[in-house]
Regions:
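Membrane-embedded catalytic cores of phosphoryl/pyrophosphoryl-handling enzymes
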Residues: 94-193
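Hydrophobic alpha-helical bundle signature of multipass membrane enzymes
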Residues: 1-96, 111-117, 122-134
Length: 193
């Protein structure tokens, strides 16, 4: 079923240059936009003197790193070849032969989307939709199987749930304590509240 769904999506490639370009853009560049949004939330926290924004941005980066480490561990245990290794596919974005499972692009974008939920619910919804398009694009361009993307989302939803339930408030409080000490020591107190 994984291969059938892969073929269904990947066979859409190389039929329309505009759609191919959009999928390549989502696959290659949208993850950087997600990172930039997180940095912007942090900068807004400085400019508007809102510690909560800085905490949210830090917490989002923290859970994203945790999820990427989980991916690294899974990839080192379960190597899954990319679709183009054993089959002829419509490969729009060349990639090395590193393990395909789970998708780092899907993991990173969904981690950021869910992490920024406390900042702005509408932004979270928009970024979640964009993350799903990123995941779809990874299959469309020939770099991932659908299961790589779907299971990446499952991992992110599970870790985010646990993180929000047990760790998020502790991480944000620790950030606040460290920030206050650093800003006092570095005399940047005027930049913060």
């Amino acid at each position: 079923m994984n291969m059938e769904l892969f073929r269904l999506i990947n066979n859409l490639a190389n039929k329309n240059g505009v759609i191919d370009g959009i999928m390549i853009f989502f696959s290659n560049y949208v993850p950087y936009i997600f990172m930039a949004v997180t940095v912007i939330v942090f900068i807004l926290g400085i400019k508007q003197k809102k510690c909560e924004y800085r905490e949210i941005a830090f917490s989002t980066i923290f859970i994203t790193i945790i999820n990427m480490i989980i991916n690294l561990i899974i990839r080192s245990i379960f190597h899954v070849d990319r679709p183009f290794i054993h089959s002829k596919v419509n490969l729009l974005v060349p990639h090395d032969a590193a393990s395909s499972f789970p998708s780092n692009h899907a993991t990173g974008t969904m981690s950021i989307a869910l992490g920024l939920e406390k900042y702005n619910k509408t932004l979270e919804v928009i970024m979640t939709i964009l993350s799903i398009i990123v995941g779809f694009s990874r299959v469309y361009v020939g770099d991932h199987y659908p299961a790589d993307v779907i299971l990446a989302y499952v991992i992110v939803f599970a870790t985010s749930y646990f993180y929000n339930l047990k760790l998020r408030s502790k991480v944000e409080n620790l950030y606040k304590i460290v920030e206050k000490k650093m800003t006092t020591k570095l005399r940047f107190k005027s930049l913060y509240n």
